[in-house]
C-alpha cells in the first residue's frame, strides 16, 4: 500500500475575497451553470457582510466562525432553517474547495437539522381554472400566450429558466418532442410532448408571424424574448385573474411530479423527465429503472389528466 503523505498548507494563502474569485473562476472552467455561479455570488455577499473583513487571509476562517454565522441567522428570528442551510451550501462548497487547495485547515461544515417545508401543489380546482381555454376571439395575445405557457409548464414540468430559453426549433411536432437545452445541471434532454400539448403549440405557432427557427418560443406582445421577471409577472397576473392566489412558476413542477406519481409513474422515469442528474433530487421516490420515456406518457401526464374530458372547440382566430 502506498504511504499517504500530508501536504503542507499553502505558504501564502490568498485573502478571503481573492480565494472566492479563484473559486468562481474554477466554477466557470468546470462549466457550472450560470444559475449556480450567480447563486454562489449572491450567498457570498451575505457571508462576507457577516465576516466584515474579506481582505484577511482565508486561513483565518475557523469552524467557530461558521457556527457564529448560523447563530447570526438564528438571532434574526425571521430566517427559516431551510434558508440557513441554503446559505451554508455556498459556505461549504467554497470552504471545502479552499481546503482542497490547502489554503486552510480542514474542518466540517455541517447543515443544521431542518424540517423540509411542505410545498402545497396546485389543487384540481385551481388547475381547472388555470387550464380553461380563453376566448380566442376577444382575448389579448398575452393572455393566450400565458394560457399556453401554463399548459406547457404542467405538461412538461420544466423550470422557468428552461422555458424562457426555448427556441422554436426546439419543438419537433412531427416527433412530439421538445429539446430542453438550458437545464440546471447543464445537461440536455429530449422530452416527449403529449398530443394535446403538441396541438396547442402548433396552434400557438400558427399565430406567430414571420418567425425563424432560432426565435424564442415564448415572446412578449412585441415579439421580444421573455425575461425571468417578465414571465413571473405574467403568471402572477394570469393566475390572479383566474382567481388563483398561488403564483409560483416552480409550483407547476411540483404539481407535475405529484400528479405523475399519483397516476402510477415510476420515480426513475420521472427523474429523467425532470432532468435531474441523480436520484438525490427525487429522494421522495424509489429509484426504479425505465428506458422508454414515451410509454403510456399521455396516460401519466398531468396535463392530460386534467383536460381529458374537455371538449375541443373549433379554432378561433385571435383578433388583430
Spans of model-derived segments:
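Conserved catalytic core of the tyrosine transesterase superfamily
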Residues: 1-320
Amino acid at each position: 500500500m502506498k504511504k499517504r503523505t500530508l501536504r503542507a498548507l499553502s505558504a501564502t494563502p490568498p485573502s478571503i475575497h481573492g480565494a472566492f474569485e479563484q473559486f468562481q473562476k474554477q466554477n466557470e472552467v468546470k462549466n457550472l451553470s450560470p444559475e449556480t455561479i450567480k447563486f454562489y455570488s449572491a450567498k457570498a455577499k451575505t457571508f462576507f457582510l457577516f465576516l466584515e473583513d474579506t481582505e484577511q487571509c482565508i486561513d483565518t476562517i475557523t469552524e467557530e466562525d461558521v457556527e457564529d454565522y448560523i447563530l447570526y441567522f438564528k438571532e434574526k428570528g425571521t430566517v427559516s432553517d431551510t434558508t440557513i442551510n441554503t446559505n451554508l451550501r455556498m459556505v461549504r462548497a467554497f470552504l471545502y474547495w479552499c481546503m482542497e487547495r490547502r489554503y486552510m485547515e480542514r474542518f466540517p461544515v455541517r447543515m443544521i437539522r431542518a424540517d423540509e417545508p411542505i410545498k402545497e401543489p396546485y389543487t384540481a380546482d385551481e388547475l381547472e381554472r388555470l387550464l380553461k381555454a380563453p376566448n380566442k376571439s376577444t382575448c389579448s395575445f398575452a393572455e393566450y400566450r400565458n394560457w399556453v405557457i401554463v399548459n406547457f409548464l404542467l405538461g412538461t414540468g420544466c423550470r422557468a429558466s428552461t422555458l424562457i430559453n426555448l427556441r422554436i426549433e426546439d419543438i419537433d411536432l412531427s416527433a412530439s418532442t421538445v429539446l430542453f437545452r438550458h437545464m440546471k445541471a447543464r445537461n440536455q434532454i429530449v422530452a416527449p410532448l403529449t398530443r394535446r400539448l403538441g396541438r396547442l403549440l402548433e396552434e400557438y405557432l400558427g399565430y406567430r408571424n414571420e418567425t425563424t427557427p432560432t426565435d424564442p418560443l415564448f415572446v412578449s406582445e412585441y415579439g421580444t424574448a421573455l425575461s425571468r421577471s417578465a414571465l413571473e409577472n405574467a403568471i402572477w397576473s394570469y393566475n390572479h385573474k383566474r382567481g388563483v392566489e398561488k403564483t409560483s412558476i416552480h409550483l407547476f413542477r411540483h404539481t407535475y411530479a405529484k400528479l405523475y406519481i399519483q397516476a402510477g409513474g415510476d420515480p426513475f422515469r420521472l427523474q429523467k423527465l425532470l432532468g435531474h442528474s441523480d436520484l438525490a433530487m427525487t429522494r421522495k421516490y424509489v429509484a426504479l429503472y425505465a428506458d422508454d420515456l414515451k410509454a403510456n406518457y399521455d396516460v401519466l401526464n398531468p396535463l392530460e389528466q386534467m383536460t381529458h374530458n374537455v371538449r375541443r372547440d373549433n379554432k378561433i382566430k385571435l383578433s388583430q
